[in-house]
């Protein structure tokens, strides 16, 4: 029979844990509102910016004279994977889903004889990938001291990536992140950013504009900003996804703690009842002996 004192201590311990998970759920809910607003506010700008770039790119075509960020290096031998995860855990499968997608992509490329390099953003992704892919690591971006992600953070990451591209360190760059859909749904996403790959259709009005000095010159100026914009959008999507996943995980943890408290309380009451029954039997047996 379980010790009553041990059961009582376990109940108090689970109650204490439930208070913590409930508090974390409430904090995540408050942060989620801000993060979701930021992610949703960035989407129209990002989509429009990409549409303009896509229109310009369509005008340039596959000309070899186009910017390298658009036409590429002429090879796809070396791939840079920018894996964006959280600095903290306790957010369900948020980090593992991104790491799983990046790992599968890296293994596929290696099987094809490609060279893979990995730049991690966020501690948790680095921890999950280092066991199998540490030899491919070339850098890490620490955002643990950043309370709210800004465009400057994205611009710094973009500058690092672009610097490596200009130095000839890779041919293709892909970012990995979670796209926010809802509190209970975040979609692991792989998005190529170099050479430029635009989502959606090109700007339908692009052919109505005359560009000076030329489409190539304008693209050469806008494409680096496009890389930073896509990275910033990914960081915002990741931020909203992280808080949504943490809120959901802490809600589940709080519910599970409540269920455990209920089970332990029933077990405690049954054990206490058994102790009282045994004591009564002993008293009655003693009285009969007299």
From Swiss-Prot:
GO biological process: proton motive force-driven plasma membrane ATP synthesis
Main location: membrane
UniProt keyword terms in alphabetical order: ATP synthesis, Cell inner membrane, Cell membrane, CF(1), Hydrogen ion transport, Ion transport, Membrane, Transport
Gene3D superfamilies listed in its UniProt record: 3.40.1380.10, ATP synthase, gamma subunit, helix hairpin domain
Membrane topology: Peripheral membrane protein
Functional note: Produces ATP from ADP in the presence of a proton gradient across the membrane. The gamma chain is believed to be important in regulating ATPase activity and the flow of protons through the CF(0) complex.
Similarity section: Belongs to the ATPase gamma chain family.
Self-association and partners: F-type ATPases have 2 components, CF(1) - the catalytic core - and CF(0) - the membrane proton channel. CF(1) has five subunits: alpha(3), beta(3), gamma(1), delta(1), epsilon(1). CF(0) has three main subunits: a, b and c.
Protein name (record): ATP synthase gamma chain
Organism: Dinoroseobacter shibae (strain DSM 16493 / NCIMB 14021 / DFL 12)
């Amino acid at each position: 029979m379980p010790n009553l004192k041990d059961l009582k201590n376990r109940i108090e311990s689970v109650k204490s844990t439930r208070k913590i998970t409930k508090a974390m759920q409430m904090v995540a809910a408050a942060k989620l509102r801000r993060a979701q607003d930021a992610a949703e506010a960035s989407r129209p700008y990002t989509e429009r910016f990409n549409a303009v770039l896509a229109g310009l790119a369509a005008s340039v075509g596959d000309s070899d004279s186009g910017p390298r960020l658009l036409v590429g290096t002429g090879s796809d031998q070396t791939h840079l994977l920018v894996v964006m995860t959280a600095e903290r855990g306790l957010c369900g499968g948020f980090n593992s889903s991104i790491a799983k997608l990046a790992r599968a992509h890296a293994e596929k490329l290696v099987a094809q004889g490609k060279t893979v390099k990995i730049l991690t953003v966020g501690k948790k992704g680095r921890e999950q990938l280092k066991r199998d892919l540490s030899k491919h690591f070339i850098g890490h971006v620490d955002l643990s001291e950043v309370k709210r992600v800004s465009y400057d953070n994205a611009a710094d990451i973009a500058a690092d990536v672009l610097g490596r591209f200009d130095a000839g360190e890779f041919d293709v760059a892909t970012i990995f992140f979670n796209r926010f859909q809802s509190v209970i749904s975040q979609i692991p996403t792989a998005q190529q950013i170099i050479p430029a790959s635009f989502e959606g259709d090109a700007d339908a009005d692009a052919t109505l504009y005359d560009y000076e000095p030329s489409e190539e010159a304008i693209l050469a100026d806008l494409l680096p900003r496009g890389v930073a914009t896509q990275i910033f959008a990914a960081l915002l999507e990741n931020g909203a996804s992280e808080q949504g996943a943490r809120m959901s995980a802490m809600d589940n943890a709080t519910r599970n703690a409540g269920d455990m408290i209920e089970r332990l309380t029933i077990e405690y009451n049954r054990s206490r009842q058994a102790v009282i029954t045994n004591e009564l039997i002993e008293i009655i047996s003693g009285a009969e002996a007299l």
